């Protein structure tokens, strides 16, 4: 099973490391002014409720909105843009369970180097819905 890391994705598409950095810079230039206007950006961590742990991004199909998607461009994960832009603090927080029982999560993103904002937002979210305090929600061991 071949592992692919985010920096390699761009070079696998024929982009040089400099071009990959340029694209990341353009992404940051688009997103940064938006994040400066708000305390946090909140989104799901995945577009799907369940993805196999051993999914091969190169060849395993995933169904999104009823359509089979194959390849690294299928965009089921919402984390990679923020992983590419390492200056933005991101915190993943459990958000409950999908209809099939799989745990779901949200990610909280803040402006550059505002780590305290994501921690405070995550803390406040979990105070509102402390789902792990409910024994029924805990994993069976």
Go through the PLM ranges and name each one.
Residues 30-33, 69-93:
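Small-aliphatic-rich amphipathic alpha-helix that forms the alpha element of a beta-alpha
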Residues 1-32, 48-49, 53-54, 94-102:
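Short helix-loop capping/hinge segments that flank enzyme active sites or metal/cofactor-binding pockets
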Residues 45:
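Glycine-rich, N-terminal phosphate-binding loop of Rossmann-like dinucleotide-binding domains
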Residues 19, 51-76:
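Short, surface-exposed loop/helix-turn segments at secondary-structure junctions
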Residues 118-141:
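Short, gly/Ser/Thr-rich active-site loops of penicillin-recognizing serine hydrolases
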